[in-house]
Amino acid sequence: MKRLKKRQIGRVVCTILQQLAITTPVHVVYSWGITNKTATQINVSMNGRKRFIAALMMEVYGFNYCGKLYITLNSVKQTFGLYTEKNGMLHEENSDIPFEELGKFLDTIIETGGRSQQEHYQRLQEFLHRR
């Protein structure tokens, strides 16, 4: 299996960060509680073959999800992939996130868990009243 060069990884991660900055309001990104961002490569299975792909790893501390997220880029299909790490294993959440939906999809995973804005607000209120 061929590992990627640092320059390749850097280009992909730069594209991911640029797209995130363009499509996602700053206050939304700040709400994710990102403590670490790292350009890396992950070993995934594609079409039955294992290979390394470049990824942006972010440690997030959101309301719905806390842990490591890995965002990948498929430049051929012009989509992003999202992997979460649980117990040291990578789990694919979605491999076909459209470019313009990246921020919204990440916010759903990290903060709202797919709930409507009203449901999310109610859950936040319940959480705050328990404290």
Label every PLM stretch briefly:
Residues 2-12, 88-131:
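Mixed-charge, Lys/Arg-enriched low-complexity segments
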Residues 65-97:
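Intrinsically disordered, low-complexity regulatory segments enriched in Ser/Thr/Pro
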Residues 2-6, 37, 50, 68, ...:
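Context-gated lysine
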Residues 29-33, 51, 62, 79, ...:
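Intrinsic disorder/low-structure terminal segments
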Residues 35, 42, 46, 73, ...:
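Intrinsic-disorder/low-complexity regions
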Residues 2-63:
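Negatively charged, low-complexity tracts enriched in Asp/Glu with abundant Ser/Thr
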